Design a protein with these regions (language model features):
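Bacterial Sec-dependent N-terminal signal peptides
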Residues: 1-21
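Carbohydrate-active catalytic/glycan-binding domains of CAZyme proteins
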Residues: 20-909, 913-956
Length: 956
């Protein structure tokens, strides 16, 4: 397409794109549309006019498809002249039909054999190909020019009919194999009664045509179950009529062979900028559509045509109304789902771009320049929250940007994908963008609110391409938008968490975390929006299925160590069990490492020493303790940043034995720290290959043993930090770095591993900023813990995994039983909600948190409209009948129970009313219907007023 011409009309296109849908393919000149509906999809098979052509020099056929009638996917060219050894020119009009699971594409082309036009047939197992010549020769030819524009129909009795021709209309009876025929070539009687009288005002040179039929027939049968059709008019033959310029007329008959009776015009002559026309008709999802072609693309015309479509309604007797060509086209009949992998060549409108295809990726978008764009219409965000956008791109130059905008090319910016140079136009890279929700506020109605974020239920989406003016920017293969429900989001949402420390006891996995304070929890008003660490206590969570987690609140705080020197700095801990006791090892920043002991994993934890367990007073490197008890009973503690230290623990777990050792990171060998030259540390970025034994260590060691291999997981060279690991045959080394568990990414900053086996699966835990990024991309130390399953190779090495958000949600180990009491703070997702322990107001952790809280009951508060608690994999069995939720409230709230999504089927509704006090809990019940089998459960909140607090719920 002429880029100069496109740029001159760009403003006009931008102004009208919101309305104009015709022509519905803008990337290429397309002609002779032939629709086919199959398996819920509308396919349109077209010809392809070459750019800047002075005749119908056509080399291939193309396929497009849609499920909503406005967003069309380009499937490229699965059939070309080269597919037919006997053809050499003129890939003209065609039609495809399905029979017995095969797809038959009837074409016309110029024959090398007869030197005339011929009818051929290709076959495929798929509507989009690849297609091959079914018989290796023309299906019909006799050297005449007449044999063009085939149309095909399978009648109710199974007889297939093939028709074609200009100016004579021919027909054949196809055999059931669809690639052979029986009987002689038939000819329709081209009488005035059959096809109307010639329009003499278009016949300046006399009576060249005997009647109004010209070419491009389309045969169909009226559905007698829908329309009161006269049996003598059961069959309809549409065609281009009147010579040049052409309009569309039709005739009717009681049988495909006639006799035919002229029925009138369907699409009269109009200024379509094309002197030919060619139609096809199809019913789809309760609508009727008329396809035709125009010359209305920029630089188009009689030899540069473009397919278009109009919706219409048949008359009561099945006859056609008058259909006029429009620029508006048709309205969408369905919304477009963006939460999946979408080919970039799927679009409702585009400016400037082209499509190409190759064997590696298939069809892709190319010829992208600054200011070009793709539009998708009626995109449904629904009740999901879009989180991650991924694009597959390639660039042989410097790349460019993809701006994701709503409703216009200058509309609200959702995010910008920076496309780098990839080293070649077909050297593809996958680029990921985490969406910034600060851009999603103040959107116009209709809208929905999720945790204070306004998002449109549906919108048009524009991919606007920007970069250097002049050169081609990049190629674009596919994109994917993933909602939070589709990706591996952080495990917890009621609080910011970091430094995960898993501990397995029986069938329960306990996860201890540090706690990044929210602004309201920071005592100093001047520090509430600071970017630094504000950490005062440690939290506990538990699960039995790896997807639904129960919060147990703070199990310990800095106040448990009265000898500490700081009020801030509750950094990474680890808890281990031995002989029925639970030992929590905690760094006291600048004051060594302490230990707490409890009789329960829930606490209360107490300091048995009154002083540090380990304290190297000459530096501040005593952080991030990791403790492991070996098979022989020997306990070890590793720690340190930027050096790796370890020491033996005695059996009492609260005293040490022997010297502190430090790992020489050049050779991986541990030496007593007091030895001169023991410390050798040279950290290099992960982008630089390690030449030393453990060259990328930064902090956060996680020491464990599995199948006789010792492992040291760690956070890599900052920043951003990866999850790396080293291995050894001994708990003391020598250590050898093995590579990544998870590579570093600019989407993150710090990290901290926790690794364990649980119920036959292996997991790695780490941290990120993905929860905070739902509210802001301005940096704060407000982290969140995520987890993912990992796989060990036969030699003990660990298979690398992608970034958290680039993975699917974790698999559930077993279903949740709703017929037992379930704490309200048990959830898979609850963004926007908050939690606290009963009797402890959430007005400041440092001020109000007792020194030891133990296992006290918790509640959910700060409940607002649009928020919800999601539980995954709830097994209702044969059916639930009732639901009870206990709450305390000074206001009211409606609790709607839904299955599988926020707008899923409603199974019950409970109304929480005021209990007179936020400390007075009462049960509120609802009848439940249609809750059987396994579903995700959404406990949705609406019509909330006042302070509402939730304790537990249960089905019966």
């Amino acid at each position: 397409m002429n880029k100069t011409l496109l740029s001159t009309i760009g403003l006009c296109l931008a102004a009208t794109a919101a309305m104009a849908q015709n022509p519905f393919v803008q990337t290429w000149f397309t002609s002779d549309p032939a629709p086919m509906v199959h398996d819920g999809t509308m396919y349109v098979y077209t010809g392809h006019d070459e750019d800047n052509a002075d005749f119908f020099w056509m080399q291939e056929w193309r396929v497009y498809s849609t499920k909503d009638m406005v967003n069309w996917q380009d499937h490229g060219s699965p059939l070309a002249l080269e597919s037919f050894s006997w053809a050499d020119d003129r890939a003209w009009a065609s039609q495809t039909i399905e029979r017995n699971g095969k797809f038959y594409w009837y074409i016309c082309a110029h024959s090398k054999i007869s030197k005339g036009m011929a009818i051929g047939v290709a076959v495929s197992d798929s509507p989009t190909g690849p297609f091959r010549d079914a018989i290796g020769k023309p299906l019909f030819e006799n050297g005449s020019w007449d044999h063009i524009d085939p149309t095909v129909m399978i009648d109710d009795d199974g007889q297939a009919w093939l028709m074609w021709g200009n100016p004579q209309c021919y027909y054949l009876k196809l055999n059931e194999d669809m690639i052979s025929y029986s009987g002689e070539l038939g000819r329709l009687d081209m009488t005035e009664e059959a096809f109307g009288s010639p329009a003499m005002n278009k016949r300046e040179r006399g009576k060249k045509y005997k009647d109004s039929y010209t070419e491009g027939p389309w045969i169909r049968k009226v559905d007698a179950t829908k329309y009161k059709v006269d049996p003598s008019k059961a069959y309809q033959l549409l065609y281009a009529a009147g010579g040049v310029p052409e309009h569309i007329s039709y005739s009717t008959a009681p049988h495909p062979t006639g006799p035919w009776t002229y029925a009138g015009e369907i699409m009269p002559l109009s200024d379509t900028k094309s002197f030919t026309n060619h139609c096809g008709v199809a019913d789809y999802k309760g609508h009727s559509y008329f396809f035709y072609h125009t010359g209305k693309l920029p630089n188009g015309g009689g030899f540069g045509r473009s397919v278009a479509v109009e919706e219409f309604k048949y008359n009561a007797d099945g006859s056609f109304p008058t259909i006029l060509p429009t620029d508006d086209g048709v309205k969408p009949i369905a919304t477009f789902d963006p939460y999946r992998k979408v080919e970039a060549e799927t679009m409702a409108f585009s400016k400037g771009i082209k499509t190409e295809q190759n064997d590696e990726v298939g069809v892709y978008v190319t010829d992208i320049h600054n200011g070009d764009y793709i539009k998708l219409q009626n995109v449904a965000f629904g009740n999901k929250i879009p989180r991650v956008f991924t694009a597959r791109v390639a660039s042989g130059l410097r790349g460019g940007q993809i701006e994701i905008r709503l409703d216009s090319i200058h509309g609200r910016l959702l995010g910008t994908v920076n496309v780098p140079g990839t080293g070649g136009w077909e050297k593809w890279q996958t680029i990921t963008l985490d969406l910034d929700y600060s851009t999603l506020t103040d959107l116009n109605a209709p809208s929905r609110t999720i945790s204070g974020l306004n998002l449109p239920a549906t919108a048009d989406v524009y991919f606007v391409f920007t970069g250097r003016k002049g050169p081609k920017l990049f190629n674009f293969d596919w994109w994917e938008l993933r909602a939070m429900e589709q990706i591996n989001m952080p495990l917890f949402q009621t609080k910011y968490t970091a430094d995960p420390s898993p501990m397995v006891v029986g069938d329960t996995l306990f996860l201890y975390t540090s706690h990044d304070a929210s602004p309201e929890d920071i005592p100093d008003a001047n520090e509430k929006n600071s970017a630094g660490f504000f950490m005062y206590d440690w939290l506990l969570w538990s699960t039995t299925d790896m997807v639904n987690w129960t919060e147990h609140g703070a199990v310990a705080s800095l106040k448990e160590f009265p000898w500490r020197s700081r009020e801030n700095g509750a950094w990474a801990i680890q808890t281990v069990e031995r002989n029925g006791k639970y030992y929590l090892y905690a760094p006291l920043h600048g004051h060594g490492i302490g230990v707490l002991v409890a009789d329960s994993p829930y606490g209360p934890f107490k300091d048995p020493l009154g002083e540090p367990l380990v304290w190297q007073k000459e530096h501040w490197e005593d952080i991030d303790p990791s403790v492991f008890i070996d098979d022989n009973g020997q306990a070890w503690m590793y720690w340190g940043n930027p050096h790796i230290y370890f020491i033996k623990l005695n059996e009492d777990m609260i005293s040490t034995s022997g010297d502190i050792y430090v790992v020489n990171q050049q050779d991986g060998v541990a030496r007593p720290v007091k030895e001169e030259g023991a410390k050798i540390n040279l950290r290099v970025p992960w982008s630089q290959k390690a030449t030393w034994a453990v060259q990328h260590y930064q902090e956060g060691p996680w020491f464990y043993k599995r199948n006789d291999h010792y492992y040291l997981g760690f956070a890599s060279t900052c920043c951003p930090e990866a999850l790396g690991y080293a291995m050894s045959d001994s708990p003391t080394g020598p250590w050898k770095e093995k590579g990544y568990i998870m590579r570093p990414t600019e989407r993150d900053r710090g990290n901290h591993p926790g690794i364990c086996d649980f119920q036959g699966h292996s997991y790695v835990f780490g941290q990120n900023y993905d929860l905070m990024h739902l509210e802001t991309f301005q940096h704060h130390e407000r982290r969140s813990v995520s987890a993912q399953e990992i796989t060990y190779n036969a030699d003990g090495t660990i298979q690398e995994i992608p970034y958290w958000l680039d993975q699917k949600p974790m698999k559930q180990l077993h279903w949740l039983n709703p017929y037992q009491r379930v704490e309200a703070e048990t959830m898979n997702w609850g963004f926007g909600l908050k939690s606290a322990k009963m009797g402890i107001e959430n007005t400041g952790v440092v001020k109000d948190m007792p020194e030891s809280t133990g296992k006290k009951n918790m509640y959910i508060f700060d409940v607002n409209d649009g928020e919800y608690i999601r539980l995954r994999g709830v097994d209702f069995g044969k059916g639930a009948k009732a639901f009870t939720i206990t709450a305390a409230a000074t206001g009211t709230a409606t609790v709607t129970l839904r299955l599988d999504s926020q707008d899923g089927p409603v199974i019950g509704t409970a109304v929480i009313k005021s209990t007179g006090s936020v400390e007075k809990y009462k049960p509120f019940s609802a009848r439940v219907k249609n809750a059987t089998g396994v579903h995700d459960l959404y406990i949705c909140f609406d019509k909330t007023q006042g302070d509402v607090r939730l304790d537990w719920w249960q089905f019966k």
